[in-house]
Amino acid sequence: KAGPRWLVIGIFRIGGAVIYGFILNKILQWGNLLTENNILIWHPEIGPVSLVIWGKDQIVGLTMMFAILMGIMLLMKVLEKFGLNRLLQRIFKPLLTKLGIGKEATNITIIGIILGISYGGGLVIRESRAGRIPPRDIFFALVLMSLFHSVIEDTLLMLLLGGNLWGILFGRLIFALSTVWLLVHLINLVSEKQFRKYFFKTFL
């Protein structure tokens, strides 16, 4: 709805996840990192499980997930009170400018990175329909948000599930910025006609 063709964004989102996972796995194997056995807190019972027990387990699991998400949301509110969002904005704004994303799209991109693609994407749709952001900046911003979004919430959730901070935050950030930097330079070689034909649809 914001303009970029869904197939292209889908390729970047799914393909980016697969490629980053592959690269991270190879780096960890090469460095013999994170090779220790994972310690599971919960061990499922072996054997047939009745429908009633399965239903109870699902309710417990969903309740725990809901409690974790509520805790993360509460923590995000606390961090916002202490100005973490403003700090992240000061960090990301010069990075986005150096990537080649125009100033009209930087604030919206930062919102998507911090709060999630649903918030940032919604703002991009509104600004795109109003014609306030150039099409190429919209495209670059959404690709970046597809690769790196909900930086606080997703990171906290993955840490609770046992993820490694370097892989789920810093490595992901480096991969996303590198991908968008390369994309900006390649797309700038494409004519406006080709860009709108293959990457961006024009609103009627």
Segments (PLM) and residue ranges:
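Membrane-embedded alpha-helical segments and adjacent helix-loop junctions characteristic
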Residues: T35-G112
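Juxtamembrane and boundary regions of transmembrane helices in multi-pass small-molecule transporters
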Residues: A2-W42, M70, L156-L204
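Small-side-chain structural scaffolding
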Residues: G3, A17, G21, W54, ...
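Secondary-structure transition/capping residues
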Residues: R86, L99, T106, P135, ...
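Alpha-helical transmembrane segments of multi-pass membrane proteins, especially transporters
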Residues: R5-A17, F82-N85, I108-I113, D137-M145, ...
